[in-house]
UniProtKB/Swiss-Prot annotation:
The gene is queH. InterPro entries: QueH. GO terms for biological process: queuosine biosynthetic process; tRNA modification. Pathway: tRNA modification; tRNA-queuosine biosynthesis. It comes from the Bacteria. HAMAP family: QueH. This is Epoxyqueuosine reductase QueH. The keyword Cytoplasm does not apply. Catalyzes the conversion of epoxyqueuosine (oQ) to queuosine (Q), which is a hypermodified base found in the wobble positions of tRNA(Asp), tRNA(Asn), tRNA(His) and tRNA(Tyr). It holds the Pfam family QueH. It is an enzyme of class 1 (oxidoreductase). Its EC number is 1.17.99.6. Belongs to the QueH family.
């Protein structure tokens, strides 16, 4: 499988990298070699899963990895996890794809320890970089454990997230593990606009903050109301059993 470093090695080191173009070049190599790689793609919510799945399922087998201990409160975390699974299930039914869903443990105290001392950082600052690293590291670890060809992140679809930073982090994480990072800039080529269209098509809940308690407070988000709304949404839902048909299975065992 092609490594992004093979492409970067042929570029001018002073040239700004267009990660969307790099991803397209990698996809062309897969097609030329008649391979369909397996990708463990970190997603933070259903909206960021939309166009990313529509695009990548043309070339690869995707498992979405919901690793988001940064999301607060817990009820909101459960809501986003549920809506993501609901979208994946409906996307598969509509398109004939077989995208799978895998969820990491929810350990918010671990996230809080990671960003200690960065609580007052502005959105897009050092706290965000640490958060990207924390979640991409978990994704890479799981990709190695389960034998995926690549790990990736759907975060680059957001116009509020710095794709350069996310890709820099992904490249650094790749150096630590025996797996490959798939770079991206999913917002390019009208990717973000398409994600908004798909949210309307699938009637997807679009949250008003990234999930981080610190960013939410800076934005003036009413977390009490968020918790109340999430609780009401989940009241008649069965998070454990409603979407077992899309859960990732490894050697025949559901994870």
């Amino acid at each position: 499988m092609i490594d992004l470093q093979e492409i970067l090695a042929n570029m001018n080191p002073n040239q700004k990298i267009n990660y969307d173009r790099v991803m397209q070049q990698m996809a062309k190599v897969w097609e030329k070699e008649s391979v369909r790689p397996s990708i463990l793609m970190h997603v933070c919510c259903a909206p960021c899963s939309t166009y990313t799945l529509e695009y990548l399922t043309q070339f690869a087998d995707i498992t979405v990895y919901f690793a988001n201990s940064n999301i607060h409160p817990k009820d909101e975390y459960h809501r986003r996890a549920y809506v993501t699974q609901q979208f994946v299930s409906e996307f598969n039914a509509k398109t004939g794809n077989t995208v799978q869903f895998l969820e990491a443990d929810y350990v918010p105290n671990e996230y809080v320890r990671q960003v200690r001392g960065l609580e007052e950082e502005p959105e897009g600052g050092d706290r965000c970089r640490v958060c990207f690293d924390y979640r991409l590291d978990k994704t890479a670890q799981k990709a190695v454990e389960l034998g995926f060809d690549y790990f990736a992140s759907a975060l680059t679809i957001s116009p509020h997230k710095n794709s350069q930073t996310i890709n820099d982090v992904g490249i650094d994480v790749q150096k630590v593990y025996t797996t490959k990072y798939l770079p991206s800039d999913f917002k390019k080529n009208n990717g973000y606009r398409r994600s908004v269209e798909m949210c309307e098509e699938y009637d997807i809940y679009r949250q008003c903050y990234c999930g981080c308690v610190y960013a939410a407070k800076m934005q003036g988000i009413d977390l009490v109301q968020v918790k109340k709304d999430a609780k009401a949404f989940m009241a008649d839902k069965d998070l454990d059993n409603d979407f077992t048909h899309i859960r990732f299975s490894y050697r025949g065992d559901e994870m």
